[in-house]
C-alpha cells in the first residue's frame, strides 16, 4: 500500500524544503549574473529629484515593496529598452543584502535625505537580497515608481511577504512620503495616479509587469528618448499669409510644444493649430527632437529657421522650443507712387539706422513705414544685403524695368504723350473725336497698339478702338471679337466712321459654317470664336476684343481660344468698362494678353497682388494685396481708364445710340412671320383692314425681338451694370424680361399699366436706394411723374411711333439731380416694323426741332443715316405707317391692340386671316382703355 505524498505530513514538509532550497539557489545564481553584468557597465549618474514620481501603494493596489515574480520565458517578451541610467543598482552582494535590511544606507534619488529612524520590515529574510534579475534597477524605497515599479498580485500571497504586518507597511509609506517631500516634489495628483494605475498595452516594463500609459508620455515630455517608437506620425506646415498652419494627427508631446509657443492659436472648426512665422524655426527644431514626428517644412521658409547657436542650448536643457529670436526681420519693397517706394518691414535697430542714412527718407507716422525715392532704390538694396538678420524683398522685376520711366513721367499717364500723326485715318473719324478720346488714341499708339482701354461706359470706347485699328490699317485683316448681341452694331460703326472702307469688306460671322477670314474686317462672337479655332491660322496681326472681361476665367473655352491668338498678335486692343468685377485675379488674363512677359506665371502675380493663401486644398487667390502698386503698373504700361466724372465737361448731357438686333438676319428660309404682310400694300383692301394688318405686323415684331432684347440685357448684367432702366411697350415683352431676371435672381422693379399708384411710388423710392437694382417699365405707363436719376443708362427694347413719349421716358433719368451723362440705347431690328418706325420717329423729331419745340436730333446723335433703302414696296409701307399714325384716334387703337395681344392665340407662322380684319374693336372696351390711358397721361 503506497502513501500519497500529499496526504503524508512528513513528505509534504520535506518537499517544501527542497522546493524552497532550489528556489533560493536559482535566485542566488541570477543575482550573481546580474552583479557580473553591472561590473561590466560604466558607472551611471544618479537620477535627479524632478524625475521621481511618488505613488501611494494603497491606490495602486500593491503592498509596499511586493512584486510579482515572472517566468523567465515570459520576461523575454517584455520591453527591450535599456535600463534607466539614473536608477540605483547594487554593485556588491553586501550592498544587495543591506538594501533590504538597512534602508537608511540605500542610495536614493535624494542623497541629502537621512531617515530619522532605522526601519526594518518584519518577514523579509536575507535571501531576498538576491532579488530576481528582472528588477535590479528599481528603487523599491525611492521615488522612481514611474520607471517600472513592480506591481503586486494575488500570486504573492504564498510567499513569506504575506506575513508582513500592517505596521511596518505604514512606516514604509510614511518613509516614502517624507522622502518625496524632502526632494521638493509637488503634491500628488490623484487623477494622474489613477491614470498611472491603469494597465497599458503599449509596452511592458523590464520586469515583465505592465507599464502605465502615462509613463511613456512623461518620458517624452522630459526629453528622454525612447529606444523603440510604436508607430510614427507625419504632417506638414501650410503657409497662410503671415502665419502658418500645422496639419498632423494628435500627439500629446507635440501639443505640449504647441502650447509653449507665444503665437499659438487653435481653430476648433478645423481642429488645427496655427502660429506666427516668428515661431516657425523653434517649432521645427522642437519637432525634430520628438521621436516618431515628421513635419514637412514650408517652401522657401529657410529664413525663418533659427541658427543652432541661439536655440540648441535651450532645447537641450528643457526639451522644449526656445523663445523666437527677435533679431531676424523680413519685409518687402512696395511702390507707392510714380517716384517713391516704401519698405514694409518690421522693426530692426540696424535697419532703422540704415534708413536714416538715405537722403530721400520720409517716415509716415500713421503707417509707421519709411519711404524713399526710386533713384535711391539700388543704393538701399545693396546696403540691406549687408545686414545678416534682415531680409528685404525687392520690387518685382517688372517694376524695375519701368523705374527710369516712372521717375521722369508726371502724375498723369497721358499728359506727356506726344500727339500721334493721324493723317492716314479718315478725316471724318478724326474730327469726331473728343479731346479725351484723342488722348486715348495717342496713348494706345505710344504703347505700340497694345493696351486695355477701360473707359467708363458711354465714353466712346468703340470709336477710339476703330481709330486705333485704322492707324495700323496696313497690317489688316482685322479681327473683332464681341458679344453676339452687338455684332451688327460694330458693322454699322465701321461703315459710319470709315467711309473709305467698302461695306463688302466687312464680314460678320453668324454661324459656325461661315469663314472667319473672308473679309478685311471680320466680326465674330466669343462663342463662335471657340468653334472656329482652326481658322485662326495664320494669326491676325490686329485684334479688337470688346468686353474683354469675358476672358477673366482662364478655364473657359472662349478664353482658351482667344489667349493664343492675343499672345502672337502684333496689336491687341482690349475694351472693357469693368475689367475686374470683384478681385484682382480677374485682371490677370487681360494683363497677360497685353503684356505676356510681365507675369508669365499666375502664381507670382497671385502672391504679389491677390493675397495668395495656401489652404489644404491648394492656393486661394481670392484676396487682394499691394493694390496701389498694381494700379501704378497698369496705368504705366497696360491700361487707360477715365471715368465720367473726369471728363464730364466734355460730354453732352444725353447721348442716344441705336443697337442692331440680328434676329431678322439669323432666320433661314422664306420671309419670316414678322415681315410685313403682302396685303398691307394691296389697294383693294379697306383702310380699316390695312390698319389691322399694320397692328398685327407691329405685334409680331415685338415677339420676334424678345430673344435679342434678353441677350442684350444679359450682356449688360455680365458687364457689371448695377442700375439701368429697360422700356418696352408690349406686355409679352415685359413678361419675358421679368421672367429672365427672376430666373437669374436679379433684383428689379416693374411698372406697367396694371400697377397701382401706391405701388408706383414705392417702386420708384426703392429704386433710388444704393443697392443694385434694375427697372422694367412700360413706355406708356411709366413715362411721366417718376424719377430714376440714380441710373444713367436707359435701354429701349421697342420703338414707339410717338417721339414725344420716348423723350418723356428718357427724361425719367435725365432730371435735376443727375450728376452724370445719360446714355440712351435703342434696340432696332432690321427686317421688322423698326425699319419703318425709326425713320418715322426721326422725321417727326426733325420737324419739331425746326419749329424750336425739341432739343433732340436723332439724325445727329445716332447712326441712323440711310437706315434702309426705300424701294417701292417699302416706301408704300412707310407711307402707310406715316398716314395711319397721323390720324386722330389711331394711337389709341394701336395701344389697345398691343395691350390685348396674346402671342399664344395666333401662330406667327399662319397666314393672315381676312375674317379677322373686318370688325372693329368694341367701343365699350375702347372707352375703358381711354379712361385707363387718361389716368397715366394726366399730369400729377
Curated annotation (Swiss-Prot):
Gene3D superfamilies: P-loop containing nucleotide triphosphate hydrolases (3.40.50.300), Tandem AAA-ATPase domain (3.40.50.10810). Residues 229-299, 325-396 form the HARP domain. It is found in: Nucleus. Its main location: nucleus. Residues 442-597 form the Helicase ATP-binding domain. The keyword ATP-binding does not apply. The keyword Endoplasmic reticulum does not apply. Residues 669-679 have a biased composition (Pro residues). A motif (DESH box) lies at residues 546-549. Residues 17-40 have a biased composition (Basic and acidic residues). Residues 18-40 form a coiled coil. GO terms for cellular component: nuclear replication fork; nucleus; site of double-strand break. A motif (Nuclear localization signal) lies at residues 641-658. It catalyses: ATP + H2O = ADP + phosphate + H(+). GO terms for molecular function: ATP binding; ATP-dependent DNA/DNA annealing activity; helicase activity; hydrolase activity. DNA damage-regulated phosphorylation by kinases that may include ATM, ATR and PRKDC. Keywords: Acetylation, Coiled coil, Hydrolase, Nucleus, Phosphoprotein, Repeat. Expressed in mature oocytes, 2-4 cell stage embryos and 8-16 cell stage embryos. Expressed at lower levels in morulae and blastocysts. ATP binds at residues 455-462. Belongs to the SNF2/RAD54 helicase family. SMARCAL1 subfamily. ATP-dependent annealing helicase that binds selectively to fork DNA relative to ssDNA or dsDNA and catalyzes the rewinding of the stably unwound DNA. Rewinds single-stranded DNA bubbles that are stably bound by replication protein A (RPA). Acts throughout the genome to reanneal stably unwound DNA, performing the opposite reaction of many enzymes, such as helicases and polymerases, that unwind DNA. May play an important role in DNA damage response by acting at stalled replication forks. This is SWI/SNF-related matrix-associated actin-dependent regulator of chromatin subfamily A-like protein 1. It comes from Bos taurus (Bovine). The lineage of its organism: Eukaryota, Metazoa, Chordata, Craniata, Vertebrata.
Amino acid at each position: 500500500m503506497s502513501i500519497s505524498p500529499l496526504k503524508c505530513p512528513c513528505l509534504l514538509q520535506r518537499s517544501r524544503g527542497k522546493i524552497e532550497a532550489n528556489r533560493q539557489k536559482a535566485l542566488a545564481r541570477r543575482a550573481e549574473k546580474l552583479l557580473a553584468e553591472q561590473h561590466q557597465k560604466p558607472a551611471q549618474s544618479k537620477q535627479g529629484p524632478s524625475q521621481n514620481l511618488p505613488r501611494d501603494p494603497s491606490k495602486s493596489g500593491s503592498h509596499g515593496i511586493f512584486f510579482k515574480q515572472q517566468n523567465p520565458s515570459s520576461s523575454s517578451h517584455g520591453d527591450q529598452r535599456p535600463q534607466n541610467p539614473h536608477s540605483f543598482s547594487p554593485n556588491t552582494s553586501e550592498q544587495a543584502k543591506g538594501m533590504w535590511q538597512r534602508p537608511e544606507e540605500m542610495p536614493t534619488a535624494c542623497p541629502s535625505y537621512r531617515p530619522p529612524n532605522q526601519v526594518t520590515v518584519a518577514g523579509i529574510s536575507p535571501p531576498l537580497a538576491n532579488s530576481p534579475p528582472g528588477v535590479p534597477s528599481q528603487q523599491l524605497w525611492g521615488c522612481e515608481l514611474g520607471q517600472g515599479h513592480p506591481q503586486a498580485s494575488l500570486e504573492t500571497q504564498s510567499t513569506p511577504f504575506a506575513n508582513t504586518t500592517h505596521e511596518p507597511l505604514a512606516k514604509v509609506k510614511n518613509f516614502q512620503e517624507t522622502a518625496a517631500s524632502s526632494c521638493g516634489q509637488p503634491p500628488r495628483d490623484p487623477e494622474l495616479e489613477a491614470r498611472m494605475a491603469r494597465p497599458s498595452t503599449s509596452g511592458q516594463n523590464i520586469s515583465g509587469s505592465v507599464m502605465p500609459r502615462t509613463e511613456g508620455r512623461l518620458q517624452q515630455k522630459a526629453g528622454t528618448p525612447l529606444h523603440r517608437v510604436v508607430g510614427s506620425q507625419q504632417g506638414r506646415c501650410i503657409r497662410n499669409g503671415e502665419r502658418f498652419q500645422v496639419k498632423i494627427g494628435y500627439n500629446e508631446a507635440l501639443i505640449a510644444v504647441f502650447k509653449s509657443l507665444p503665437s499659438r492659436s487653435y481653430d476648433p472648426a478645423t481642429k488645427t493649430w496655427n502660429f506666427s512665422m516668428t515661431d516657425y524655426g523653434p517649432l521645427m527644431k522642437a519637432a525634430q527632437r520628438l521621436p516618431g514626428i515628421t513635419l514637412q517644412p514650408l517652401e522657401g521658409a529657410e529664413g525663418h529657421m533659427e541658427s543652432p547657436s541661439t536655440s540648441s542650448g535651450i532645447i537641450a536643457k528643457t526639451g522644449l522650443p526656445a523663445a523666437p529670436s527677435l533679431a531676424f526681420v523680413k519685409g518687402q519693397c512696395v511702390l507707392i507712387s510714380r517716384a517713391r517706394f516704401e519698405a514694409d518691414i518690421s522693426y530692426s535697430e540696424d535697419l532703422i539706422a540704415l534708413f536714416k542714412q538715405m537722403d530721400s527718407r520720409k517716415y509716415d507716422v500713421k503707417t509707421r513705414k519709411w519711404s524713399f525715392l526710386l533713384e535711391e532704390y539700388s543704393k538701399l538694396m545693396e546696403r540691406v544685403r549687408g545686414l545678416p538678420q534682415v531680409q528685404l524683398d525687392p520690387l518685382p522685376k517688372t517694376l524695375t524695368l519701368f523705374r527710369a520711366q516712372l521717375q521722369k513721367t508726371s502724375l498723369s499717364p497721358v499728359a506727356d504723350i506726344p500727339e500721334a500723326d493721324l493723317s492716314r485715318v479718315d478725316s471724318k473719324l478724326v474730327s469726331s473725336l473728343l479731346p479725351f478720346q484723342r488722348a486715348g488714341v495717342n496713348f494706345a499708339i505710344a504703347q505700340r497698339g497694345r493696351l486695355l482701354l477701360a473707359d467708363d461706359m458711354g465714353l466712346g470706347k468703340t470709336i477710339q478702338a476703330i481709330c486705333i485699328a485704322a492707324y495700323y490699317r496696313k497690317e489688316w485683316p482685322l479681327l473683332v471679337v464681341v458679344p453676339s448681341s452687338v455684332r451688327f452694331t460694330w458693322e454699322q460703326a465701321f461703315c459710319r466712321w470709315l467711309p473709305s472702307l467698302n461695306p463688302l469688306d466687312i464680314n460678320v460671322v453668324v454661324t459656325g459654317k461661315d469663314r472667319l477670314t473672308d473679309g478685311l474686317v471680320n466680326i465674330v462672337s466669343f462663342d463662335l470664336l471657340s468653334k472656329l479655332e482652326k481658322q485662326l491660322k495664320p494669326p491676325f496681326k490686329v485684334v479688337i476684343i470688346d468686353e474683354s472681361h469675358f476672358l477673366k476665367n482662364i478655364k473657359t473655352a472662349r478664353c482658351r481660344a482667344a489667349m493664343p491668338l492675343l499672345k502672337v498678335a502684333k496689336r491687341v486692343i482690349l475694351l472693357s468698362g469693368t475689367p475686374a468685377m470683384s478681385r484682382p485675379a480677374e485682371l490677370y488674363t487681360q494683363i497677360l494678353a497685353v503684356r505676356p512677359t510681365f507675369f508669365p506665371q499666375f502664381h507670382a502675380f497671385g502672391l504679389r497682388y491677390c493675397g495668395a493663401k495656401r489652404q489644404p486644398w491648394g492656393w486661394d487667390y481670392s484676396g487682394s494685396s499691394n493694390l496701389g502698386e498694381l494700379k501704378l503698373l497698369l496705368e504705366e504700361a497696360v491700361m487707360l481708364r477715365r471715368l465720367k466724372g473726369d471728363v464730364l465737361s466734355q460730354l453732352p448731357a444725353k447721348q442716344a445710340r441705336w443697337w442692331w438686333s440680328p434676329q431678322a438676319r439669323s432666320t433661314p428660309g422664306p420671309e419670316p412671320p414678322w415681315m410685313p404682310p403682302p396685303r398691307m400694300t394691296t389697294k383693294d383692301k379697306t383702310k380699316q383692314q390695312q390698319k389691322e394688318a399694320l397692328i398685327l405686323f407691329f405685334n409680331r415684331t415685338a415677339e420676334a425681338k424678345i430673344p435679342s432684347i434678353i441677350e442684350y440685357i444679359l450682356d449688360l448684367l455680365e458687364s457689371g451694370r448695377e442700375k439701368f432702366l429697360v422700356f418696352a411697350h408690349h406686355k409679352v415683352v415685359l413678361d419675358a424680361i421679368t421672367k429672365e431676371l427672376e430666373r437669374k435672381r436679379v433684383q428689379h422693379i416693374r411698372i406697367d399699366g396694371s400697377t397701382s399708384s401706391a405701388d408706383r411710388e414705392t417702386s420708384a423710392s426703392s429704386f433710388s436706394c444704393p443697392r443694385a437694382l434694375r427697372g422694367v417699365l412700360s413706355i406708356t405707363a411709366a413715362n411721366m411723374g417718376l424719377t430714376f436719376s440714380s441710373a444713367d443708362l436707359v435701354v429701349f427694347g421697342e420703338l414707339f411711333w410717338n417721339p414725344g413719349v420716348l423723350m418723356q421716358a428718357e427724361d425719367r433719368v435725365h432730371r435735376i439731380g443727375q450728376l452724370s451723362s445719360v446714355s440712351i440705347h435703342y434696340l432696332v431690328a432690321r427686317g421688322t416694323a423698326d425699319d419703318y418706325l425709326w425713320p418715322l420717329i426721326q422725321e417727326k423729331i426733325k420737324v419739331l426741332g425746326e419749329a424750336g419745340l425739341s432739343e433732340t436730333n436723332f439724325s445727329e446723335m445716332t447712326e441712323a443715316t440711310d437706315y434702309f433703302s426705300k424701294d417701292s414696296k417699302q416706301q408704300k409701307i412707310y407711307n402707310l405707317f406715316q398716314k395711319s399714325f397721323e390720324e386722330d384716334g389711331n394711337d389709341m387703337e394701336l395701344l389697345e391692340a398691343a395691350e390685348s395681344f396674346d402671342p399664344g392665340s395666333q401662330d406667327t407662322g399662319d397666314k393672315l386671316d381676312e375674317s379677322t380684319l373686318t370688325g372693329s374693336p368694341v367701343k365699350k372696351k375702347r372707352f375703358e382703355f381711354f379712361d385707363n390711358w387718361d389716368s397715366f397721361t394726366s399730369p400729377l
